[in-house]
Amino acid sequence: MSEENNHKEKSKNEIKKEKKKIEKEKKITELKSKKKINEKNNTINYDDDDDNDDDNFKNKKWGEINNENYKEIIKNRFVKEWSNISDLNESCVGKYVLIRARVSNIRSFGNSLCFLQLRDGLSSIQAVISKNDENNSKSMIHFINSTITKESIIDIEAILTNSSTPIESCIIKNLELKIYSLFLQSKSNSSLPLQFDDLSKPTTYQNYDDNGYTYVIPLNSRLNNRCLDLRTFYNLSIFKIQSAISNLFRDQLLINDFIEIHSPKIIKQSINENSFKLNYFNEIAYLSESTQFYRQLAIVSDFKRVFEIGPVYRTDLGHTHRHLNEFTSLDFEMTFKDHYHEVLDFLDNLMISIFKILETNYENELKIINNYQLQFEKFKFSTKTPRFTFSEVKLMLIEFSENENNKFCMELFDYLNVQEERIFGKIVKEKFNVDYYIIEKPSSEYQPFYIMPDSNNEKLLNSFHIYINGEKIGSGSQRIHDWKLLEKRYKNYYINHNNNNNNNNNNNNNNNNNNNNNNIENYINIFKFGCSQHAGCSIGLERLVMAYLGLENIRKASFCPRDPTRLTP
């Protein structure tokens, strides 16, 4: 009898448990049904009351992403496709989007309201979360206030809405995001050596510290914290343009049947005795200062048209605004039929095509740089580039000197110093209203021996320099392809060079001269197998970017610059 009663009580307990289970499943089903999601256009109607979150859902709307929960978080997203902030526009209003962005700023009003300024690429937008929003809770806002820091990276699902007032602190001013879910993807240290807002202010802008004193973030401080400095829209724009220039250079050459080569940067011999030396398996080697020898070797090998984009190394000790010890060189070499101007014309057209595409396709980046630099002037060029001979340049400088009562260039020198280059750039801008021009036919006295002399005047060379805003960004020349003439020119150069340095005739110099003679002999020998007429050019990428954008220092155009005092980062 007792066993029968126990059986009945057990059955009652099982029935109660089963009933509770059914009720719980029903409640869960009801909660799920309240989320009316339209998969087609990513819209959602959420009917829950505020703070009525069930344990099954609360932890899925906010939190930190880790290796254990990220699969579950991905699974529970109702927006499946990622968007960029730059993709958001009026046509997206009312739709839910999934975005990963960096937090630039946080403005919180207790646990009831919070504004996040988010940025991604070259765009930014405001996101808002309020406890009055039926999708949110105080707990979610508390998580943001207690956990999210500036420069952290977050993933959000949010609905795009029109903002009631323009948001001046963001790139997108007329739209904002109302957050539905938020997950911390990567947390930044709360103590930052430099703030994004300070880094984003113009270099001439005087920032105020807590004591009211003005200060400007020095370039060295920026370079010491390069990963923070590079995050600014200004720097991102610079390197997007730098990337575009190198890609356009490559694309245009490939279209014109050039072959890209990759020459060694560790070499056995160096013409310049001041090249960087290194121990190469107990043998002295050098870092390459130029790819010219290998480009000419390719021409001798009948490649006809070659180019290379790569690093070169110089041991310049000067701490100037335009010199680096490692930089990227845009180089090409090509044969021609009758005159080296065929190569110069090709280069000129190449540069003009790059300028045109930058002007058209990178208007936003140029505008950002313009706003940052304050004194930025739009780059100007002509489809008919002004070309000047060296003697014409000197005469124009003398005329300018006389008009300005300035005697800095009253004599005809065989080179242009930095002051003369800048002044001539201003003369060209005033007379021709362009920033880009070419100077050719320099005197042979201070130029390399391998450049072909002018057939009408051996004291002049078939050589040219490219200028932007008074800065020399590159140079090129017709090379001597006749080994006998090359040998003769070298002997004359060698004699003159020794006469100019006759006070340094010690044993070490004699050894260096012997090594240089061996290097030159190896260079001359490749032309004994026959070589086509050819010319080439080298352009410093960082120098080009600096001059084109009007940057005051070449280090701003280098991702991580190397100069005599900097080996990091």
Curated annotation (Swiss-Prot):
GO cellular component terms, semicolon-separated: aminoacyl-tRNA synthetase multienzyme complex; cytoplasm; cytosol
Keywords linked to the UniProt accession: Aminoacyl-tRNA synthetase, ATP-binding, Cytoplasm, Ligase, Nucleotide-binding, Protein biosynthesis
UniProt main location, coarse: cytoplasm
An annotated GO BP: aspartyl-tRNA aminoacylation
EC numbers: 6.1.1.12
Stretch list, region Aspartate: 292-295
GO molecular function, one term: aspartate-tRNA ligase activity
UniProt-listed Gene3D superfamilies: Bira Bifunctional Protein, Domain 2 (3.30.930.10), Nucleic acid-binding proteins (2.40.50.140)
CDD domains with a match to the protein in the record: AspRS_cyto_N
Family note: Belongs to the class-II aminoacyl-tRNA synthetase family. Type 2 subfamily.
Name of this protein: Aspartate--tRNA ligase, cytoplasmic 2
